[in-house]
Amino acid sequence: MKAIILENPEHFTTANIDEPNQPRAGEALVEVSRVGICGTDVAGYLGKMPFYTYPVIPGHELGVTVLSMGEGVENVKVGDRCSVEPYMNCGECFACCKGATNCCESLEVIGVHKDGGMCERFVLPARKLHPSEKLTMEQLALVETLAIGCNCVNRARPGEGDKVLVIGAGPIG
């Protein structure tokens, strides 16, 4: 199976890697169709992301298709086109139990701390897949980026008629 590997800052390689294992209970095997490239990927490539783990297969903004599932998976089925929630949280620590999964004590981001989607296929927890019958693969790959903006609005809770100042010249804003 083909993959792109960021060996260390400013050094990509292409490689043939082993096929992923069959999914275990609660997991899904997906085929990658689209990968978004964002500021995190650029910073990782430039060596300016202090928590990047090298070598790594980048890619966390993904449009994928479900190929198979392990036991107990109910949120997706074979053939579903999905966006991927790339933040792998434990679900058990204090932060996760309070709903602050982004503050998980064991947080790992695919494509940053662990291998991501710049490969043909990979296995991940099925709970991190969000199916859509309407969005294109290109749109599915951008859902993660949209979610960041939506979370900002949700946290700020602006009301009708409120003035909002958006500061930032980054790729997401």
Predicted regions, residues:
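Cytochrome P450 core scaffold surrounding the K-helix E-X-X-R motif
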Residues: T40-A43
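Residues that mark the start of a beta-strand
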Residues: K2, E27-L29, K163
